[in-house]
Amino acid sequence: MFDKLLSTPLVTAAAASLDLVAFPCAGSGSAGLRGWREILPADWRFTIACLPGRETSYGQPFARDMARLADDIAQELRGRRAQHPDLPLVLFGHSMGGLLAQLVAHRVPADALVVAACPPPGRRDAEDDGRPLDHDELRREVAGMLQAVSPIEPGLLDELVGLTAPVLAADIELLATYRAPTTPLSCGIWALYGDGDPIEPLPWAAETTAAAECRVLSGSHFFVQESPRAVVAELRRCLTPVRGGKA
């Protein structure tokens, strides 16, 4: 069992209007989403899932089973929400993080699920289903992800790619263990896509008995890192009903 899988939020539950938990894409960690703290509404309690084997848990074994990882995150999240269980809960996941967020939503009832650059279960291609990437493919994927956050000097980029490639490889193996839930959620699901991403923008209508919306924003598969303000603006728009009408 893994522990300390969630970052420490800066806003206390008592002062918050919404509990937002974000799940990064494969191969990354919390660093790519920390900047959201500066642009999210001040009364949103923001937490990032910190997966094993990277950042503060560097050297820890990687997670090998997505369902068990979702169990561990859900247990920690339930404990954190125990004193304020009625605070609206929203789970956000980027790419692989969207599938992990979906599994957690089946374990901890959420008020909304937002997935980014993540096709619905059953519409994922072979690469999305955990096919191992060769050395060159891994390097291209990692370089694209890192450059989406900010431009990096070529020499430093090579070093960062070398450090990050094993994380992405482990996450691709983790993705291969994903099994789609057999029952739908009861919360709304918003699916966000980049207009430069080859993924076909489709709603997650089969995964919920509630509303399922699909929106296309400007950017590549890594539009979450490329245009964080646009993503946060879209979150504010789609989550207005969850916050009782407050934008």
Where are these regions (language model features)?
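Non-catalytic, mobile gating and regulatory segments of ester bond hydrolases
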Residues: 1-247
